[in-house]
Amino acid sequence: LALTTNGLGLDRRAAQLRSAGLDRVNVSLDSIDASVYATTTRRDRFADALRGIQAAAMAGLNPIKVNAVAMADTIEQVAPSLLDKSLREGWQLRFIEHMPLGAQAWSRQAIVSAQRILDIFAANGFELTELGRPDRRPAQLWQVAPTATRPGGTVGIIASITRPFCDDCDRTRLTADGQLMTCLFAQAETDLRALLRGGASDEEIASTWQQATWFKPLAHGRDAGPNAQPLNLTRRSMSTIGG
C-alpha cells in the first residue's frame, strides 16, 4: 500500500502511517532548488517537504520514490541536480511527462519527452542502461552507473504521452475523497466512500473495487469507447486526486 503526497506534514505523520499499515510513499518533489520549488508549487515550503521525506525514510516507508513532472522551462536545470540528489540519498526518482489533468493549460508540443530527459542525463555525464518496465510498472527504468564521487542506482520515466503503457496497466487509485479511479484520465469514478460510510463489509468493498478494475478503459480516458479521442482532459487536477 503506497501513498502519494507532497510531503508536507509527513514529518509529523510518517510513524503513525507506518504503524497503520502503509508500506511506502511517493513524494512529489519537482526540484531541489528552493526557489524553483516555490515557483512550481506556489508555496515556499521546500524545507518542510524535505523533512517529510527524511521522516518517511526513518519510519521505514522505503523505498522512497520521488516524482517530478518534467517542465520545459526548468528541465535542463532540474533533471541532473535532482537525479544526483536522489542517487546520493537512495531515493528512487521518477520523472513524469506533463499530462493534461484538470483545467491547466496543456499542449502536446510543450511536452518534455522521455527521450529529451534521457538526452539531458547523457549530456550531464550519467551513464544509463535500460532495464525496461519490470512487473508492468508505469515507469520505464534505467540503471545509473556509479562514479568515483557518486553512488549508482536507478531512475525511471513515466512516459504516459510519448510511450503509453495502457495495454498492460493494472493500476487503480483511491482519491483523497474516497473515489476509485481506474485511470488518471478517467471520466467515471467509483464511490467507495459511500460504501465505507454506509457500513459495507470488506467483501462488498473488495467486490466493487474488483468490478471497477475489470472495466478499466482501453487507453487514456477512453470511457466513450475505442473510437474516442485517446486523451480526455479530466475535471480533476493531480493535487485533488492524491491517493
Q: What label would you give each PLM region?
A:
Residues 1-96:
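Radical SAM/AdoMet-radical enzyme domain recognition
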Residues 84, 88, 98-243:
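Auxiliary Fe-S-binding modules of radical SAM enzymes
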